Swiss-Prot record:
Position of sequence motif 9aaTAD: 985-993
Entry protein name: Peroxisome proliferation transcriptional regulator
Domain notes per entry: The 9aaTAD motif (residues 985 to 993) is a transactivation domain present in a large number of yeast and animal transcription factors.
Oligomeric and partner information: Heterodimer of PIP2 and OAF1.
Gene Ontology cellular-component terms listed: nucleus; Pip2-Oaf1 complex; transcription regulator complex
Provenance organism: Saccharomyces cerevisiae (strain ATCC 204508 / S288c) (Baker's yeast)
UniProt biased composition (Polar residues): 879-928
Keyword Iron-sulfur carried by entry: no
Length: 996
């Protein structure tokens, strides 16, 4: 081959870049297609629902532009806009003419406009990428994850950063500057945690609370507790056996020929299992109250195996009789026995005292004397690993893995599984093993399973409900974490066509065909039906999650709305709570029906809360998305309001569930013995709810402040025509703000009393909210954002951390208020829109936050109980003194002395007596918390100065230029709550403060 001059390397130099302006839109330019240059959107972008952006002004202009060409182009643009103005003017005339005499053409035009709005393109994942990065980890934050709001919302990020930057009162910053890998090396951290523990222990009421306090404070100080450090190791132990290389045998010539491995496991199981009477009591409780919630095994087959295998000596101690055949099957059923005993124990630990009032089988002394420790999980996993379960899987293996997942998820002592812990590993293992044994196909597809001599007929429906459970658990978990589960629909496509409108009836026919004729067949059919509906709900939520993290392109808005409507209809029609008519002539049957309905109601209530939680997260993501777009495109403002309102409505719906659950309204349809599942679901929903309340409150407060400034400016100019509407808006915003503040304080109190000492995750999150609530009571939740930051005292490490995680740039902090004003579109809402939000409060107006006479569980502390919370530190030095409750200056809400509004501020009474709210009588009759009294719109704002002829300006406090807020109780204390927060790694969001 010969090289010519044209192909020589000398000719491969990069030529000069030509600076030519492109007048077509970006989408057409990238696609290299013709653009009609129509404004504001070209024809191609309009047709394909693409974003149409003309970036002529942003392009680098040529060095020597051609003047004649520029003049010609400008003249062409003038002609274009002149013609467009004429056309629009004519359209306007036609519009008003059509208003007087409606035509079919106008109706068609309106329909077209509505369709165009519904097909508005949405691209959440592509336009809002977020990767949190530290030296030891990286994590992507997706739109439906819990942390998306924290890292995407400017208001919330700023609030959190303002807490972290309070160096003078916060011990977190010094701890970070030093050795952050060992928090106990910081004296300020250790001293505050020790002081916190002493006060909490002193005020604790139950032994379980004292145990949790010691455990949680040890975690804060990073003290190693072997029992708590093996949770991850237990999951890993599924994959290997720490015994020997050989596996368990399935048959043996005689019992004397057992392998050493089998003998060792037999001895361990005999030592682990409690006496006969205790086992029977635990099993009775499990099968009566819990089994139908998690029916991952066949009750009859399990009981038959246990009856054959588990024998007892004269003292009632367990002695195993394994026989010589089917040894592995018997060991697998023993593993199931160990796991369900552990789950039964977990469910009973949620009742603080007087267990005898709820369970006829278990007593408090029995729990204390024969606890089922978490070591049984490790033992069961070791037995499975010794069977080489990956290669020799069966239905029993699936049952064990599913019960292991449940034991981790629902146990508050095993870490925060289902949030960021390795329950992902377990459920994905279950999917792999389930597909390997054909669970993803209906059992009727396999002739071998239907052979009467080769297989047990009871396995057919067991396999069905196992696969439905796997689908539900895997898709719900991935959706809650905002992650993508690979093809969840393909997991069920071979099982049944869920798109068929009659799919439920088809599935029920299959189940009926394979029923065995036992007494429990009717209940089994109902369980299969509600599990099928739960799988449908999980698939809807998974579709919603998958759409929000789709990178392939934009999605029409109506696609998201259709999924929301379908999920809401399913929740409304198939997840309603059931009641039972009491039959005094057949008490036993009535009791059984009550118990079974309680189980179904637990599934329904959990499904409603999870469904509404995912709807709220979707609303949050869309609200933030349209908030950004509306700053550039005015037509998006209506969409922003739509999802802002939806956030308010979904939040109120979730809070309604919280109130009804904790005040005992569900006690007739929901047993306390199944509350461990519902409480876990509420734990998942509380953080998102509380953070959303903060976001709404700050936006509404800023909007009110901006309108107050506008009101003053109108008075100064003498322009009084708009004053009535502005003042009416201020009243409405004030109503919304104060009502949401009440909700935030009540949810905070409920979480403190019922969840703080059950879940370490909530314990740490509420420690952060202790700071927020303290600011809220002072009236500084919003104004505290604008405290001047001394950049000289802020280390580069802290500044970098804030920028990489929260996206806060301290160099631009001087323009913070301008950025927040620019982001706040709430000020543009109309009066009708504000009234619509206020109307939502009617849904919970008459719901009591706590009712001592009607509590779900008398062991749960009521509002009047002196429940130990970190807030007790605020008044630990002032004992036995009356504490005036929080009161609004216009419409006080009487929630009693122990409510959130009445926590201590006595230390500053002498110096701030003139600012104190009026005290409510301290008689016993005033201490019970009645219903919430939300403020009506006409009671929030003083109209005495709202005369349109009055040109006096509204008075603003000096701590914020345009700040106005009704007075809240003063709280100047000798010991700051932020010092306690200083020991935390940001409530388990280790992506913020991770050890180096």
């Amino acid at each position: 081959m010969y090289f010519t001059d044209e192909s020589s390397p000398a000719m491969n130099r990069v030529g000069k870049k030509r600076n030519r302006l492109s007048f077509v839109c970006q989408a057409c330019r990238k696609a290299k297609t013709k653009c009609d240059q129509e404004k504001p959107r070209c024809g191609r972008c309009t047709k394909q629902n693409l974003f149409c952006i003309y970036d002529v002004a942003r392009q680098a202009a040529p060095r020597n532009p051609n003047k004649d060409a520029t003049i010609a182009r400008l003249k062409k643009e003038i002609r274009y806009w002149r013609n467009k103005t004429v056309d629009l003017t004519q359209e306007k005339k036609d519009f008003y003419t059509a208003l007087k005499r409606p035509t079919e053409e106008l109706a068609a035009r309106r329909t077209c406009k509505s369709l165009q709005e519904n097909s508005f393109p949405i691209s959440l994942y592509k336009t809002h990428p977020r990767l949190i990065m530290t030296k030891v980890m990286k994590r992507e934050i997706n739109p439906l994850s819990e942390k998306y709001l924290i890292f995407q919302d400017t208001f919330l990020k700023t609030l959190i950063a303002s807490v972290l930057l309070s160096c003078s009162r916060n011990s977190m910053i010094p701890a970070l500057n030093a050795d952050i890998s060992r928090s106990r090396t910081q004296p300020c951290v250790k001293n505050n945690v020790v002081k916190m523990r002493e006060v909490l222990l002193k005020n604790s009421k139950y032994e379980s609370q004292r145990k949790s306090i010691n455990e949680f404070t040890d975690r804060l100080l990073q003290r190693k507790n072997p029992e708590e450090q093996i949770a991850v190791n237990k999951v890993i132990s599924l994959l290997y056996s720490n015994r020997e290389s050989s596996y368990l045998e399935d048959t043996c010539p005689t019992e004397n020929d057992y392998s050493d491995l089998l003998k060792g496991y037999i001895n361990e199981i005999e030592k682990t299992l409690p006496p006969k009477a205790i086992i029977e009591q635990y099993l009775s409780h499990f099968f009566e109250h819990i089994f139908h919630l998690i029916p991952f095994a066949s009750k009859e087959m399990l009981e038959e195996s246990i009856h054959t295998t588990v024998q007892y000596n004269e003292l009632g101690e367990v002695r195993l009789s394994m026989g010589t055949t089917l040894i592995r099957n018997k060991m697998e059923n023993l593993c199931i026995l160990l796991l369900i005993l552990r789950i039964a124990y977990i469910s009973l630990t949620f009742i603080e005292d007087k267990i005898e009032d709820y369970s006829p089988y278990i007593t408090k002394e029995m729990l204390e004397q024969y606890p089922i420790q978490s070591e049984v999980i490790f033992l069961a996993q070791q037995i499975l690993a010794s069977e080489n379960w990956c290669a020799c899987a069966n239905e029993n293996t699936i049952s064990c893995l599913l019960y292991i997942w449940c034991a981790f998820v629902f146990s508050p002592t095993e870490g925060d599984f289902l949030l960021e812990q390795p329950s992902d590993v377990i459920i994905n293992l279950v999917i792999l093993i389930g597909t390997s044994i054909g669970l993803h196909r209906d059992p009727s597809d396999f002739p071998a399973l239907n052979h009467p001599e080769a297989s047990d007929k009871r396995l057919l429906n067991l396999r069905r409900i196992q696969w439905l459970s796997i689908i539900s658990m895997a898709t719900l978990e991935s959706s809650l974490k905002g992650r993508l589960l690979v093809s969840p629909l393909s997991m069920i496509d071979l099982f049944i066509d869920v798109r068929d409108p009659n799919c439920v009836e088809i599935y029920k026919k299959r189940v009926k065909k394979d029923l065995t004729g036992s007494e429990s067949d009717e209940q089994l059919l109902e369980i299969h039906e509600i599990f099928f509906h739960r799988a449908q709900l999980a698939l809807f939520l998974s579709d919603l999650n998958n759409i929000t993290i789709s990178y392939s392109g934009s999605v029409p808005m109506d696609t998201l709305e259709t999924l929301r409507v379908k999920a809401n209809e399913l929740l409304k029609n198939k997840f309603q709570l059931r009641s039972v008519d009491i039959n005094i002539y057949d008490e036993e049957k009535t009791f059984q029906k009550l118990t079974f309905n309680s189980i179904l109601n637990s599934i329904s209530l959990s499904g409603q809360i999870l469904g509404k939680l995912m709807m709220l997260r979707a609303s949050i993501a869309l609200m933030l998305y349209f908030e950004t777009l509306a700053m550039e495109r005015s037509e998006c403002l209506s969409f922003f309001y739509k999802y802002f309102f939806q956030c308010c409505a979904d939040t109120i719906s979730l809070i309604r569930f919280f109130f009804l659950y904790f005040n005992g309204s569900y006690e007739k349809v929901l047993s306390s013995l199944v509350c461990f599942i519902t409480t876990k679901v509420i734990q998942l929903a509380v953080p998102t709810t509380m953070f959303t309340l903060l976001v709404i409150i700050m936006r509404v407060e800023l909007a009110k402040n901006m309108l107050l400034v506008k009101c003053n400016e109108c008075n100064a100019r003498g322009d009084i025509s708009d004053l009535p509407e502005i003042k009416e808006k201020i009243k409405s915003l004030d109503t919304i703000k104060e009502n949401f503040e009440r909700l935030l304080l009540e949810v905070y109190l409920l979480a403190s009393q019922n969840l703080r000492f059950k879940y370490f995750y909530i314990f740490k999150m509420l420690t952060l909210f202790d700071v927020f609530i303290q600011r809220l009571r002072k009236g500084q939740l919003f104004s505290g954002l604008f405290v001047k930051v001394d950049k000289d005292l802020t280390t580069k490490k802290i500044a970098t951390m804030l920028e990489l995680t929260l996206g806060i740039n301290l160099d631009k902090s001087d323009h913070l208020i301008d950025r927040l004003k620019g982001k706040n579109l709430t000020v543009n809402f109309t009066l009708d829109q504000l009234y619509q939000i206020i109307k939502e409060f009617d849904r919970i107006k008459n719901i009591g936050v706590a009712d001592p006479q009607n509590s779900l569980n008398p062991s749960k502390p009521n509002m009047k109980d002196n429940t130990p919370t970190i807030e007790l530190l605020l008044n630990s030095s002032v004992e036995n003194e009356s504490v005036p409750p929080y009161s609004s200056s216009n419409d006080p809400t009487n929630v009693g002395n122990a409510s959130t509004y009445s926590l201590a501020h006595n230390i500053s009474n002498q110096n701030n007596e003139e600012n104190m709210p009026p005290s409510i009588g301290s008689s016993e009759s005033n201490r019970a918390a009645p219903n919430l009294n939300f403020m009506p719109i006409n009671n929030n704002y003083n109209n005495s100065g709202s005369n349109i002829n009055n040109n006096d300006n509204v008075k603003l406090p000096s701590n914020f230029k345009n700040y106005y807020d009704p007075p809240m109780s003063s709280l100047d204390i000798s010991m700051d709550v932020p010092d306690i927060f200083g020991s935390l790694d940001f409530f388990d969001y280790d992506l913020l403060f991770q050890n180096d």
